[in-house]
Amino acid sequence: MLKSTARKRKAPSTGPSGLQRRVRARKEEVDSEIDESSNPSENEGSERSSDEDEEDEEPKASRSSKSNLDMASISFGALAKAQASMPKRSKKESAESEESEIDDSGSDSGNESKYRKRGGLAKRSSKHAPTEMSSKRPVSRKREIFQVPKVEARDPRFDPAVNSGGSNFDEAKAKKAYAFLDEYRDSEMAELRMEIRKTKDAAQKERLQTLLQSMQNRKKAAKRKDDEKRILEEHRQREKDLVQQGKQPFYLKKSEQKKRLLTEQFKGMKKKQVNKVIERKRKKVAAKEKMELDQLQRR
């Protein structure tokens, strides 16, 4: 089939129509020569241009016919081999060519390409690569001319003016200024005792007793702390006086401080109360030792 089509395409078109065309063209040339002889100055330029056009058209027509004949004679297998032998275009090159085609096509496509160049659209070098986006952001039109100082919340728990960690903090002054809180706590404890006596609900009574016990323990701990500070202050004042007399200073150890605190604590107690406190202390120490022994046995 391919050979027959090639032969058909190769065969030149010879017929009466072709001869008539040639005859007509020659007749027209004779007429034009007669016109030129009548008016030679006007038709010289037109003759030259027509001759040149005919000369250009003849080789173009011959070239196109030759190329068509050559392509028709080539088999599909040869075309496939030629295409396979040609270097393949990468995706990047094809994308760039597409972008260039888009840039060339009209004003709308030009605006789109500009938008892409600015980084408005997300790009990826390949389908496995992460999406690349521009980190540039438009600057806000709002401008801060006068900087307003930031209002920060003041928490007294972490305020150096309130805590003892501050350099200018005076604990004695603070305690004197907030002495009314101790009186307020004492009145609260008295109200709790009255409620415990009046209430008949066992659960409510137990809850009020635990609250009263915690308040009493806090008061005792504060009193013990005050006693420790008072003993240390007395000892320091005594040592200052002795140093002025020319003696060596003596610094109290922690164990010595505890002994003096216990003696101060037992001074205002009766013998029965002292025995009770000592027994409670002994039980506490025994329970602690027992717990430590159990932990050692488990290991």
Curated annotation (Swiss-Prot):
One of its GO terms (biological process) is maturation of SSU-rRNA from tricistronic rRNA transcript (SSU-rRNA, 5.8S rRNA, LSU-rRNA). The gene is RRP36. InterPro entries: RRP36. It is found in: Nucleus, Nucleolus. This is rRNA biogenesis protein RRP36. Residues 1-11, 115-127 have a biased composition (Basic residues). Residues 186-290 form a coiled coil. Belongs to the RRP36 family.
